[in-house]
Amino acid sequence: HQCLSPSSIEFLRKLPYRVDFCELGKKISVMHYCMNQKNQCINYTPNPTESNLLELFPERNQDIVIYGHDHTRMICHSQNRWFINSGSLGCPANDKNIARAAILEIEENNHISVRSVEIKYDVTKVVEYIDWIKYPASGEIKKFFFGVN
């Protein structure tokens, strides 16, 4: 991307496509989406159902899968596994002025809870900044990510 410095590009290239860790005995995987080793999305499914999620993330050794790519919130508990997509943090599309996030809590008694968070912010300032810096593909970005024509 032409707005990134060479060191930023190199940093991004070195990021893993998936991070696995354990917290209070719960196995957690964090990834952009279900991807192969070439960092390509596989089996993209918009608005996945519970059965879609079980197919998209078939590894049974994870207690919690945190993923993104699809900007629509999806929080699902199925077969003792959690699938968490908090939705888009900074690209509200048609839900103007809302940044979405989620809070995952794991208690020592093994109880897991997930809370959705919505925070209003001034998208106009972001769109104006995109124009000001002459961001590449700004028209498409504003249309698809911010609902601005």
Q: Whereabouts are the PLM-identified features?
A:
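Active-site neighborhood of phospho(di)ester-bond hydrolases with catalytic His/Asp-centered motifs
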Residues: 31, 63-69, 83-87
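Active-site environment of divalent metal-dependent phosphoester hydrolases
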Residues: 36-37, 64-77, 91-96
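Short, acidic/polar N-cap/turn motifs at the starts of alpha helices
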Residues: 16-20, 72-73, 101
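Acidic, His/Gly-rich catalytic cores of divalent-metal-dependent hydrolytic chemistry
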Residues: 77-149
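Glycine-rich, charged/polar anion/phosphate-binding loops
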Residues: 15-17, 70, 88-90
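Conserved catalytic scaffold of divalent metal-dependent phosphoesterases
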Residues: 1-64
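Metallo-beta-lactamase
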Residues: 38, 45, 52, 74, ...
